[in-house]
Amino acid sequence: MHVDIVSIFPEYFRPLELSLIGKARARGVLDVHLWDLRDFTHDPHRTVDDTPYGGGPGMVMRPEPWGETLDAVRAEAARLGVDAPLLIVPTPAGELLTQRAAERYAAEPWLAFACGRYEGIDERVLLDARRHMRVEEVSIGDYVLAGGEAATLVIVEAVARLLPGVVGNQASVLDDSHAQGLLEGPAYTKPAVWRGLEVPEVLLSGNHAAIARWRREQAIRRTAVRRPELLDALPPGSLTPHEEALAAEARLHAGRSAETPPPAGAAGSQAEGPPGTSPSDAAVAH
């Protein structure tokens, strides 16, 4: 897979030289090309932003350097005989990233990322890009970051680990949270007893069918408590009647726990009260 990343901070992506992603790049499974947006400016100050039309706070990224950079990305793809890459624009206004989306991106031969900063990228850049390539605006969550770089790192790792040959044991990818529409259950390793806490006996039994059943039940319970909407989104018949009962029991238990107030004066109680916080006023896309 080819990945192009456009940013004013290309050094932000040094982590892609590490761990599984770095090894995948060294083996040629993943090819990452960084583009410095400022290389496509034509003034002494290498300006990439300006004040917004209509007024308002902050600055907006100018269209000219973005247009030239994306033209260069498409030209490189054409030189290698590849259709224009799928352009992903990280932004809090985009569609939420999911495991299904990561799987879809992993099937693409070429991805490009446009990392915005400040108040974002001039909208005409995306309008123009859509004339030549597919464009998807993607959010990694309902919060705001200072720029699109961190979100791009998240998306690249989520996608790259799905490529054949990146993860040593590909079966582990199939057991991940969200891979089957459920959160992954708890994991344990040696020693069997640590600080008085024991590994569940079933995991020591050697009974593979019982272990698989226990893991699925734990995944269902955890999903029911932490992300019940994922269970609601499963296709009809995905859960057996027994599993549906487990999920209902877990939800009921979680609801009762939430309704039980903490003891007076306990840490985190309303009487103690955490200090107030205010949301960040940083304004760009992730």
Curated annotation (Swiss-Prot):
Homodimer. This is tRNA (guanine-N(1)-)-methyltransferase. GO terms for cellular component: cytosol. It is an enzyme of class 2 (transferase). The keyword tRNA processing applies. InterPro entries: Alpha/beta_knot_MTases (IPR029028), tRNA_m1G_MeTrfase_C_sf (IPR023148), tRNA_m1G_MeTrfase_TrmD (IPR002649), tRNA_m1G_MTases_N (IPR029026), tRNA_MeTrfase_TRMD/TRM10 (IPR016009). Its EC number is 2.1.1.228. It catalyses: guanosine(37) in tRNA + S-adenosyl-L-methionine = N(1)-methylguanosine(37) in tRNA + S-adenosyl-L-homocysteine + H(+). It comes from the Bacteria. The lineage of its organism: Bacteria, Bacillati, Actinomycetota, Actinomycetes, Acidothermales. Keywords: Cytoplasm, Methyltransferase, S-adenosyl-L-methionine, Transferase, tRNA processing. GO terms for molecular function: tRNA (guanine(37)-N1)-methyltransferase activity. S-adenosyl-L-methionine binds at residues 116, 140-145. One of its GO terms (biological process) is tRNA N1-guanine methylation. It comes from Acidothermus cellulolyticus (strain ATCC 43068 / DSM 8971 / 11B). HAMAP family: TrmD.
